[in-house]
Regions:
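DNA major-groove recognition helix of helix-turn-helix/homeodomain DNA-binding modules
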Residues: 4, 67-82
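Recognition helix of helix-turn-helix/homeodomain-like DNA-binding domains
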Residues: 47-64
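A short, Lys/Arg-rich alpha-helix, primarily the initiator
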Residues: 2-38
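Short C-terminal boundary/hinge segments that cap the last helix of small helical domains
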Residues: 77-97
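Short alpha-helical "recognition helix" segments of helix-turn-helix
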Residues: 39-44, 72
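Short acidic DE-rich linear segments
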Residues: 2-3, 93-105
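Key DNA-contact positions within bacterial/archaeal DNA-binding proteins
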Residues: 41, 52, 81
Length: 105
């Protein structure tokens, strides 16, 4: 992971993200879809997508770009690896299925 200097001033942290930060840091977020009811419009705006596109990414977390993962991590003031780990655990089955199809051809 890169060297991330998280902003420390209270004006650069949206209080709506405090619960999301706590949930990620405590390990209670195990799927990205768990964010669906936690400031979805605000997060969609942060990511520069509409609500429907954000909802689609929550259902298919492999569609989040590296930039979007890092942007969310900085906005939530967490290490981007935390989000990466959630996504990796969530998509491991899809990755294995795709690899199996590849080798069967």
């Amino acid at each position: 992971m890169g060297n991330w200097n998280l902003p420390n001033d209270e004006h650069s942290f949206d209080p709506n993200f405090e619960d999301i930060q706590t949930l990620f840091l405590s390990g209670r977020i195990t799927t990205m879809y768990q964010l669906v009811k936690r400031s979805p419009t605000k997060i969609a705006k942060l990511l520069g997508v509409n609500y429907e596109a954000y909802h689609n990414k929550l259902s298919n977390p492999e569609k989040f770009t590296e930039f979007q993962i890092n942007l969310m991590a900085l906005a939530f003031r967490i290490d981007p690896d935390i989000i990466h780990n959630v996504i990796q655990k969530e998509i491991v089955g899809k990755v294995k299925d795709r690899l199996k199809i590849f080798y069967e051809k």
